[in-house]
Amino acid sequence: MGYQFKPDPDMAVEKIRIGRVPALVVKPQKSAPDAPGVLWIHGGGYITGMKEMVYMGRAMDLVRKYGAVVVSPGYRLALQKPYPAALDDCYQTLLYMKDHAAELGFRKDQIMVGGESAGGGLAAAVCIKARDDGKVHVAFQMPLYPMISNMDTESSKDNHGKVWNTRRNHLG
């Protein structure tokens, strides 16, 4: 996995594997024992991975501003592995976080799930799965502009913008 963000001397960054899922752990160099844990799920329309994304900015802010411990999975992408592969990878990461909270440096009763775009959609799905399975309690969810549907409205059918448009919505 190639990650693109600037090193910060106040943060510790570690690459780990959770089964087959590569993940990035970011935390303060001097973390507090009562830190919250954050499962941060990157965006990218379900088709681009972390190395191409700049979506770690908000996750890094959670570390800087709140002393959170962030775990961000490099989930399998839709073009290679369709649904539910990405959801399974993210949920596996959440269960790992619960089981390894002390080792990672946060309270297991303070786990938040968040993400942007496709990551926001996955965050919502992970929280629903966690609720239904009852294996882990999510304290808070933060799906930012979540990609939760590939359905087009009449107005969105004419959206041919550069960043996200109808064609990309169907591809993702």
How should each PLM-predicted stretch be described?
Residues 5-172:
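Alpha/beta-hydrolase superfamily serine-hydrolase fold, recognizing
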Residues 1-3:
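Alpha-helical membrane-targeting segments
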